[in-house]
Amino acid sequence: MKFVLLFGVLLVALFSYSSAEMLDDFGQADEDELLSLIEKEEARAKECTPRFYDCSHDRHSCCRSELFKDVCTCFYPEGGDNEVCTCQQPKHLKYMEKAAGKAKKFGGKIKKWFG
């Protein structure tokens, strides 16, 4: 029994040492890639188009609301030949955000009652 326990401890120690070595090897390359991706994401996040503003220049540039990303919706105004595109939130997503907000608020009340 002591032999099995000693063998198990030795096996766990070797496994943790080998996994730490592999993480060190991959760590530097992954860290550099992660930093560049974060910088790109921050640069892209600054360029989002607010709700009800023109998004015809880039239809994927709409900002995010609390839970969902707004959608670039294009339409022709009455009596006009020009297409107008604006960032809008679809109604079903608007209702889902309201429901999530109410559920979050109700969860806070329950936590307050029983917490």
Swiss-Prot record:
Molecular function, one GO term: toxin activity
Keywords for the protein's UniProt record, in alphabetical order: Disulfide bond, Knottin, Secreted, Signal, Toxin
UniProt keyword Disulfide bond, yes or no: yes
Principal subcellular localisation of the protein: secreted
Tissues expressed in: Expressed by the venom gland.
Propeptide: 21-44
GO cellular component: extracellular region
Localization of this protein: Secreted
Coiled coil: none
Signal sequence interval, chain numbering: 1-20
Family recorded in the similarity comment: Belongs to the neurotoxin 19 (CSTX) family. 01 subfamily.
Domain text: The presence of a 'disulfide through disulfide knot' structurally defines this protein as a knottin.
Protein name listed in UniProt: U3-lycotoxin-Ls1k
Organism of this sequence: Lycosa singoriensis (Wolf spider)
